[in-house]
């Protein structure tokens, strides 16, 4: 049994002392691929410092963890560091799309909605994912570009979006028309 597996079992048994010992051994002895999986698990259950330590160790072999590191840095309020991690992901990487989406989110958090929109526009050139289109619609709405927001909302399947986000495109389109002074 790998140290990572022993750590997970110890966490499940609420034996954090043993979990910490197995964590340290895992960092020294377990294969990098296993560490990435452990990092993802630890991140998902809120053990962010441990996940971060793993990601820092493997980030040059697994550059996709830079997205995770950026999210952890943002959680800690270190937006500048988050951008540094995201900038380490090259445009030809499979993870570049994820990096753009996280960048858009960070710019949005910083109140730079125009820049966030630009990042989502770039992401929309790489993928037609409905959540990217939804993000663009929401940003256009927030910026007061209601006609553009309506066009984006109209591209979305209301049932799918409602199930994913709890947001009705019909309601958003209605609000956008109302903001334009068109009440019919």
For the regions a protein language model found, what residue spans apply to each?
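Canonical tetratricopeptide repeat
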Residues: 5, 37, 68-71, 102, ...
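Start-of-helix register in tetratricopeptide repeats
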Residues: 1, 33, 64-67, 98, ...
């Amino acid at each position: 049994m790998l140290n990572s597996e022993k750590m997970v079992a110890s966490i499940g048994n609420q034996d954090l002392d043993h979990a910490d010992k197995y964590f340290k051994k895992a960092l020294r002895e377990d294969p990098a691929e296993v560490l990435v999986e452990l990092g993802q698990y630890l991140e998902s259950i809120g053990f962010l410092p441990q996940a971060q330590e793993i990601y820092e160790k493997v980030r040059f072999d697994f550059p996709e963890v830079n997205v995770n590191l950026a999210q952890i840095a943002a959680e800690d309020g270190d937006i500048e560091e988050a951008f540094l991690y995201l900038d380490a992901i090259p445009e030809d990487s499979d993870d570049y799309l994820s990096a753009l989406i996280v960048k858009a989110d960070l710019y949005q958090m910083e109140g730079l909605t125009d820049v966030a929109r630009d990042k989502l526009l770039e992401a929309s050139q790489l993928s037609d994912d409905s959540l990217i289109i939804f993000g663009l619609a929401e940003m256009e709405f927030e910026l007061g570009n209601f006609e553009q927001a309506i066009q984006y909302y109209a591209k979305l399947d209301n049932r799918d979006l409602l199930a994913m986000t709890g947001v009705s495109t019909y309601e958003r389109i209605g609000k956008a028309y109302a903001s334009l002074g068109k009440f019919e």
